[in-house]
C-alpha cells in the first residue's frame, strides 16, 4: 500500500499556533500576572503563603515546556519580569519544590458536551536511569526507576480529558477506575488495548454506561450476559478468524490517537521527570498535561487524505 499523503487545509492558522508555542507571553499571560501573589485569607494558623497556586503552576509549566531545572526556571522568569518591567518576582526554587508536593494543578479545558470516542493508554516517564546509548553499549544498571502516566484522550479534539501518575508496579487496569472517574461528561464509547480486558475495567464502564471497545486477550472466554460488548468482541475472531472486522465496525482503530498523545508527550516535553519527591512528580506530570492541552487548544492541523484518517501531528 502506498504511503498516505496528507494535505493540511488550515496551514496558516496551524503554523501560527506552532510559532506561538515558543512565545513566553503564551505561557506567562495577564491572568498569571494578576494572580501571582496569594490574596486569599489563610484558613489556618501560621505564616501565609506569598505566591498563589497559579504562580507555582506557571513555573512548573514553563520548566517543562523549555526543559529547565528549577534554578534555571527561576532565573529565566526573573529575567523576563525584569525585561518587561513588571514588579513581580519568581518564587524561589526551594519554594517551588516544596509547594509542588501539595499544589493542585488543573489541566482540564472548558470544553463541554458528549465525547464520542475516549481513547486510553499509558506510557513510562523515567525518574532515574541511564540513557539508551549507555544501555546499548554497556547494558543496563540495576537501578532504573519509572513512573506511569495514564491518559484518556478525546479522539476528536485530541484534548486530554483524564490524567494520572502512578508507580511502575500499578497495572493499567488497576489505574483505570480512578482515571475514568475524573470526568462526569457523557461518553459514548471508550477504547483501550488488551491490558484493560478485566472485570474491574468493564464494570467501571458499565457503571458509567460507556460502550467498551477493548479487544479480548488470547484464549478469552465468554462472561455473563451483562458483558454484551465484550462477548461480541470474543465471538468475532472465533467466527472470522481475526479481530479485523470487529475493529473496523466499532471504529476501534481510533485508539491510535492515544499513541499519538504519548508521542506528543515524549517529543515536546521529554520522557523523564526531574523532581525527586513522588507528590512533586505528580505535579510535574500534571503541569506537562496542562501545557499539552494548551498547545492543543491553540491550534491543531486539519487535513484531507485520499485514504482517510488523521494526520500524526505533534
Predicted feature residues:
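Helix-centered, glycine/charged polyanion-binding patches within enzymatic domains
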Residues: 2-7, 194-267, 275
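Hydrophobic alpha-helical segments, principally membrane-spanning helices and signal/leader peptides
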Residues: 5, 37, 54, 77, ...
Amino acid at each position: 500500500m502506498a504511503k498516505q499523503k496528507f494535505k493540511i487545509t488550515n496551514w496558516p492558522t496551524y503554523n501560527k499556533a506552532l510559532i506561538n508555542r515558543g512565545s513566553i507571553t503564551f505561557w506567562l499571560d495577564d491572568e498569571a500576572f494578576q494572580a501571582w501573589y496569594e490574596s486569599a485569607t489563610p484558613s489556618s494558623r501560621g505564616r501565609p503563603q506569598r505566591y498563589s497556586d497559579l504562580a507555582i503552576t506557571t513555573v512548573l509549566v514553563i520548566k517543562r515546556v523549555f526543559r529547565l531545572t528549577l534554578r534555571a526556571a527561576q532565573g529565566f522568569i526573573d529575567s523576563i519580569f525584569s525585561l518587561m518591567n513588571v514588579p513581580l518576582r519568581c518564587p524561589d526554587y526551594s519554594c517551588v519544590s516544596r509547594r509542588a508536593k501539595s499544589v493542585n494543578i488543573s489541566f482540564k479545558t472548558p470544553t463541554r458536551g458528549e465525547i464520542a470516542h475516549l481513547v486510553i493508554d499509558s506510557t513510562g516517564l523515567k525518574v532515574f536511569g541511564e540513557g539508551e546509548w549507555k544501555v546499548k553499549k554497556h547494558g543496563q544498571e540495576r537501578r532504573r526507576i519509572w513512573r506511569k502516566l495514564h491518559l484518556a484522550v478525546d479522539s476528536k479534539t485530541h484534548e486530554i480529558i483524564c490524567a494520572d501518575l502512578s508507580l511502575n508496579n500499578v497495572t493499567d487496569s488497576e489505574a483505570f477506575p480512578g482515571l475514568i472517574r475524573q470526568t462526569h461528561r457523557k461518553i459514548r464509547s471508550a477504547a483501550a488495548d488488551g491490558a484493560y480486558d478485566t472485570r474491574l475495567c468493564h464494570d467501571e464502564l458499565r457503571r458509567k454506561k460507556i460502550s467498551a471497545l477493548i479487544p479480548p486477550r488470547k484464549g478469552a472466554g465468554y462472561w455473563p450476559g451483562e458483558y454484551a460488548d465484550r462477548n461480541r468482541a470474543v465471538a468475532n475472531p472465533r467466527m472470522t478468524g481475526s479481530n479485523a472486522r470487529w475493529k473496523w465496525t466499532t471504529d476501534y482503530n481510533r485508539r491510535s490517537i492515544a499513541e499519538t498523545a504519548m508521542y506528543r508527550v515524549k517529543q515536546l516535553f521529554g520522557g523523564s521527570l526531574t523532581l525527586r519527591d513522588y507528590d512533586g512528580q505528580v505535579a510535574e506530570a500534571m503541569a506537562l498535561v496542562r501545557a499539552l492541552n494548551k498547545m492543543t487548544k491553540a491550534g491543531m492541523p486539519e487535513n484531507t487524505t485520499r485514504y482517510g484518517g488523521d494526520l500524526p501531528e505533534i
